[in-house]
């Protein structure tokens, strides 16, 4: 149990080139990222995800593990992230994409054929409702408030200290 002063080089070789291209992306500066292949997140919807080893696991200067432990944990982290992600997408991507497609198709249909016609109908009816409401206010509510105000304005209180 001694202090190892040499910095070790960490390299991880994988067969899938597209994965190794994306493992060193600087998410803080999306302009530096130029993907020669197809961009699967063109609108940067998931740019907030930090899944790099250094973003998740960090050892302060005062507490360092052995370099071999650090290298092995880094390699295991990257490999398990790669394998588990691929495994989960094989079984979940197609059913979840199907469910999301059904959900968004249903929401789009409801919005287009029910919600927007209802909103437009309400907006068309509102000017006449506004005219009727103004008439009701002028005929019923304004005289009522005026008479209540006059009644309370004639009340006077006198306090005496006995």
Swiss-Prot record:
For the biological process aspect of GO, one term held by this record is: insulin receptor signaling pathway
Q: How is it modified after translation?
A: Phosphorylated on serine and tyrosine residues. CAV1 promotes phosphorylation on Ser-23 which then targets the complex to the plasma membrane, lipid rafts and caveolae. Phosphorylation on both Tyr-19 and Tyr-27 is required for insulin-induced 'Ser-727' phosphorylation of STAT3 and its activation. Phosphorylation on Tyr-19 is required for insulin-induced phosphorylation of MAPK1 and DNA binding of STAT3. Tyrosine phosphorylation is induced by both EGF and insulin.
- Origin superkingdom: Eukaryota
Intramembrane spans? 87-107
Instruction: List the subcellular locations.
Output: Nucleus; Cytoplasm; Golgi apparatus membrane; Cell membrane
- Give me the Cytoplasmic side stretches, as residue ranges: 1-86, 108-162
Chain positions found as Phosphotyrosine: 19, 27
InterPro entries for the chain: Caveolin, Caveolin_CS
> GO MF terms on file?
D1 dopamine receptor binding; protein heterodimerization activity; protein homodimerization activity; protein kinase binding; protein-macromolecule adaptor activity; scaffold protein binding
Cellular component aspect of the GO annotation: acrosomal membrane; caveola; caveolar macromolecular signaling complex; focal adhesion; Golgi membrane; nucleus; perinuclear region of cytoplasm; plasma membrane raft
**Which topology term describes how it sits in the membrane?**
Peripheral membrane protein
Sorted alphabetically, the keyword list is: Cell membrane, Cytoplasm, Golgi apparatus, Membrane, Nucleus, Phosphoprotein
Instruction: Spell out which residues are annotated as carrying Phosphoserine.
Output: 20, 23
Family of this protein: Belongs to the caveolin family.
Q: What does this protein do?
A: May act as a scaffolding protein within caveolar membranes. Interacts directly with G-protein alpha subunits and can functionally regulate their activity. Acts as an accessory protein in conjunction with CAV1 in targeting to lipid rafts and driving caveolae formation. Positive regulator of cellular mitogenesis of the MAPK signaling pathway. Required for the insulin-stimulated nuclear translocation and activation of MAPK1 and STAT3, and the subsequent regulation of cell cycle progression.
Subunit composition and interactions = Monomer or homodimer. Interacts with CAV1; the interaction forms a stable heterooligomeric complex that is required for targeting to lipid rafts and for caveolae formation. Tyrosine phosphorylated forms do not form heterooligomers with the Tyr-19-phosphorylated form existing as a monomer or dimer, and the Tyr-27-form as a monomer only. Interacts (tyrosine phosphorylated form) with the SH2 domain-containing proteins, RASA1, NCK1 and SRC. Interacts (tyrosine phosphorylated form) with INSR, the interaction (Tyr-27-phosphorylated form) is increased on insulin stimulation.
Mind telling me what this protein is named? Caveolin-2
Classification lineage: Eukaryota, Metazoa, Chordata, Craniata, Vertebrata
Question: Gene encoding it?
Answer: CAV2
């Amino acid at each position: 149990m001694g202090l190892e002063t040499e910095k070790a080089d960490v390299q991880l070789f994988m067969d899938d080139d597209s994965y190794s291209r994306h493992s060193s992306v600087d998410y803080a500066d999306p302009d530096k990222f130029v993907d020669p292949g197809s961009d699967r997140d063109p609108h940067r919807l998931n740019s907030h995800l930090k899944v790099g080893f250094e973003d998740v696991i960090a050892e302060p200067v005062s507490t360092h593990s052995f370099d071999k432990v650090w290298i092995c944990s880094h390699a295991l982290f990257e490999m398990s992230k790669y394998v588990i992600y691929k495994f989960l997408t094989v079984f979940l991507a197609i059913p979840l994409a199907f469910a999301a497609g059904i959900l968004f198709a249903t929401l789009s249909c409801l919005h287009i054929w029910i919600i927007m016609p209802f909103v437009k109908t309400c907006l068309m009816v509102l000017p006449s409702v506004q005219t009727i409401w103004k008439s009701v206010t002028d005929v019923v509510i304004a005289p009522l408030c005026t008479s209540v105000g006059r009644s309370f304005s004639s009340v006077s209180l006198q306090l005496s200290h006995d």
